[in-house]
């Protein structure tokens, strides 16, 4: 200000107003930032496999109610569904999932190997971090006209088997491993298992691309005498095509198909959602969640819930992937990679 000049009260007022305005803006911005962070800490993204959308829709509602009751806080769970392996790639490439819930352990291992989930993810939750399972069974046409009861019936002359290509779908990989393991469970050697699986695929008229394609081939195109699929798909078939179209046949032995889950460490470290993500996956083991799984024909780990739904989940002897194959990762290398056992045993058109 020039010497002898009186201060301009309006200039001072303007400076004060401007400073006040800036302060309000700063406070508002800070509030929004903190509020957004707080909201993010009560919001999860579950990236899951395609056919689990109905189960998780019901589970999320149950978890939100449980979380509100026990903590007094609201929580919002968003879902993303697609093929399990495609989802794993999306998360690896940057999709900010807080948790992943897949249907094959190889997809979680892929993320673990890339540092996205913990290396020891399978030890973070009970049952090797698989709160639910399914198994492989046979769907036959109503009345079971070919009298198919067990694995040996699938290699008989004149029996056509519909199955997913094990190189393109987890459904197919589990079917292949179940057939192989069924021989081993009866005391057979790997050589005898390979011989059986080779005969098995000679009765496969066409390999389906995926589970839904296999169902379409069997029920819409009317090809085959038996469809090998997940137990959890029986409800879907009845819902889409109507009850009475097929009969479910439980073989003497089958494989345990695990549904693994994991916290995405990369995301929760950034968002501060680690405790919430763990609580979300922990609650999958609760009786309420296990009941919801049973409702959707997903086999619960809880023996009590399983027994309660014994009319739906028939008793069946099961073996794990680890028992004969080490892991799904090892099975992939030995059996399903190019030049592996499957390529040696399967010849299209024969």
Predicted segments with their positions:
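Short helix-loop capping/hinge motifs at secondary-structure junctions, enriched
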Residues: 143-149, 168, 181-189, 267-275
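N-terminal segment of the mature folded domain
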Residues: 41-169, 310-311, 343-350
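Sec/Tat signal peptide C-region and signal peptidase I cleavage site
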Residues: 36-40
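Extracellular/periplasmic juxtamembrane helices and adjacent flexible linkers that interface
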Residues: 268-350
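Short beta-strand->loop
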Residues: 47-49, 140-142, 160-186, 200-204, ...
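Ligand-binding pocket segment of bilobal, Venus flytrap-like solute-binding proteins
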Residues: 186-252
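Periplasmic-binding protein-like
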Residues: 130-134, 197-201, 208-209, 241-274, ...
């Amino acid at each position: 200000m020039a010497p002898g000049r009186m201060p301009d009260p309006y200039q001072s007022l303007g400076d004060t107003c401007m400073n006040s305005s800036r302060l309000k803006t700063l406070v508002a911005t800070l509030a929004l930032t903190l509020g957004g962070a707080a909201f993010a800490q009560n919001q999860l993204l579950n990236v899951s496999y395609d056919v689990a959308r109905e189960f998780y829709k019901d589970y999320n509602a149950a978890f939100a109610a449980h979380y509100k009751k026990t903590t007094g806080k609201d929580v919002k769970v968003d879902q993303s569904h697609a093929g399990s392996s495609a989802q794993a790639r999306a998360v690896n490439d940057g999709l900010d999932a807080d948790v992943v819930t897949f249907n094959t352990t190889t997809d979680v291992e892929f993320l673990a190997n890339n540092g996205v989930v913990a290396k020891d993810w399978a030890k973070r939750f009970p049952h090797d971090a698989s709160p639910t399972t399914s198994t492989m069974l046979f769907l036959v046409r109503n009345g079971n006209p070919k009298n198919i009861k067990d694995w040996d019936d699938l290699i008989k002359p004149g029996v056509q088997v519909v199955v997913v290509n094990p190189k393109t779908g987890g459904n197919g990989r589990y079917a292949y491993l179940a057939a192989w393991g069924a021989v081993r469970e009866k005391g057979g050697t790997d050589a005898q298992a390979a011989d059986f699986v080779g005969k098995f695929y000679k009765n496969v008229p066409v390999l389906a691309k995926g589970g839904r394609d296999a169902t379409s081939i069997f029920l819409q195109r009317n090809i085959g005498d038996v469809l090998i699929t997940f137990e959890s798909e029986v409800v879907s078939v009845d819902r889409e095509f109507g009850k009475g179209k097929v009969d479910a046949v439980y073989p003497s032995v089958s494989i345990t198909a695990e549904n693994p889950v994991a916290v995405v460490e990369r995301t929760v470290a950034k968002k501060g959602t680690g405790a919430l993500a763990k609580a979300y996956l922990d609650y999958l083991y609760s009786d309420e969640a296990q009941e919801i799984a049973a409702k959707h024909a997903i086999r619960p780990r809880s023996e009590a819930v399983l027994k309660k739904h014994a009319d739906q989940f028939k008793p069946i002897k099961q073996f794990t992937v680890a028992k004969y194959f080490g892991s799904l990762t090892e099975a992939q290398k030995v059996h399903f990679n190019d030049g592996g056992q499957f390529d040696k045993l399967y010849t299209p058109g024969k």
